[in-house]
Amino acid sequence: MQTCTLAVDIGASSGRHIVGTVQNGKITLQEVYRFENGVHRENGHLCWDIDTLEQEVVNGLKAAHDAGFAPATIGIDTWAVDFVLLDADNKRIGDAVAYRDERTEGIREALEKEYGLTFADHYARTGIQYQPFNTVYQLMALKKEHPEQLAAAKTFLMVPDYLNYLLCGVPANEYTNASTTALVGADSRDWDDALIEKLGLPRGIFQPIKTAGTVLGHLTPEIQKAVGFDAEVILPATHDTGSAFLAVPARDEYAAYLSSGTWSLLGVENAAAITGPDSCAANFTNEGGYEYRYRYLKNIMGLWMIQSVRRELGEKTGTRPSFPELIAAAKEAADFPSCVDPDDNRFLAPASMIEEVRAACADTHQPVPAATGEVMQCVYNSLTQDYRRAVETLQSLTGKTYTSLNIVGGGSQDGYLNQQTANATGLTVFAGPTEGTALGNLMVQFIHSGDFADLAEARAAIRRSFEIKEYQPE
């Protein structure tokens, strides 16, 4: 059996178990298991199938063992903001409602009207941008719809916290994900007790906040028996974007980062939060990062639009087009000029992404895309112009001029998007590594194991180990 570390990286559409090893200062990755993920409608809401996720995590651990690996450590990362509640017997309460559900509509306005909490005040306390699905709005929606669930709750765990708890039996809230609740103080980096009390939420359900690198414990005897080995459960940056930022092989302090996946998150790492009125107006966020740094970034709709178009075309024809086929179609319509605002809530969960893009173009008196290539080119135009605006705003807010954009994650494989991004922003684009999130997850484990002394050494190893493609503006 080969000793290794294991990253369980779960996204909105799929999850992977990726084994990592270090030899002669170089990192090797091997995917040992993959599974599908998604939402379904239950009790009137879009929900995650948490029971299936739990089983798939265990299935992947078995697969690693069956492939001849003996993980010494395991780390789990997922998306942010979503959570589960446990009762006094540690049983789950209610459903794990997904962030794309509509239950939070109107909640932000209700907080101001009923609790006197303006968004400007909220932002000044937490530094977290407005998104309709922020955990605080989900909790307040739950309080309105099912107050009995909050009353019965004894433990609040975000999705990766809960999966970690199932593996080792230790409840904890990890900092990078906890920060996305908009209930953590930007300066204190801890639960904002006054804010929680003001909103009438039960303070006792929130667990002590732990940082990435914390060892929670060993696999429970039941899990050990099921998977065939024991391992330490370590907290990575459990928010997938937090892990992805760790994997950015930035060369200097003038590099901006873009984690490109279902969501595009563009920003930089800061030592202190920026929570002034200009930052609030720009809706930039100060999410928790590794070693209590801040990921100062803009949340952009990202590849969700492309994924939705692809899925929709597959439903219409019976065969999903490949991403290269969609890129080729866009190139054929490269002169199509229209673009929309990817951050408009109309694109969050439309019945038809293609028709929503067309309607948005019509609403703004632009040419309406007809063929698939025109729709795709419109999406590419929209994303890259959003990236350009985000870079310009970032420079204004930080007072820095950035010279490069480092793209990690699945979107870094899209050479057409990378080149269009370089053209739109005027920045040199460095693309890769592709497995940014899983790699960042593993970095924390490698530092814990002593394979690397610190993050700087780990990032240098990433540059040695993976192909990084360069795109110059044209």
Question: Model-found features: residue ranges?
Answer:
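N-terminal glycine/serine-rich phosphate-binding loop of ATP-dependent small-molecule kinases
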Residues: 1-94, 152, 224-233, 425-427, ...
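Active-site core segments that coordinate phosphate-bearing ligands/cofactors
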Residues: 6-7, 19, 112-126, 137-158, ...
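Short, basic and Ser/Thr-rich N-terminal targeting/leader segments
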Residues: 11-13, 72, 77-79, 135, ...
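Short, acidic/turn-prone active-site loops that include or flank metal/cofactor-
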Residues: 34, 97-104, 262-264, 433-437
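Active-site phosphate-binding/coordination module
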Residues: 61-134
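Short glycine-rich phosphate-binding loop at a beta-alpha junction
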Residues: 70-78, 155, 208, 400-409
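Glycine-rich beta-strand-to-loop/alpha-helix junction loops that act as flexible
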Residues: 77-80, 212-213, 260-263, 404-412
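Nucleotide/phosphate-binding loop and acidic/charged catalytic motifs
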Residues: 101, 173-178
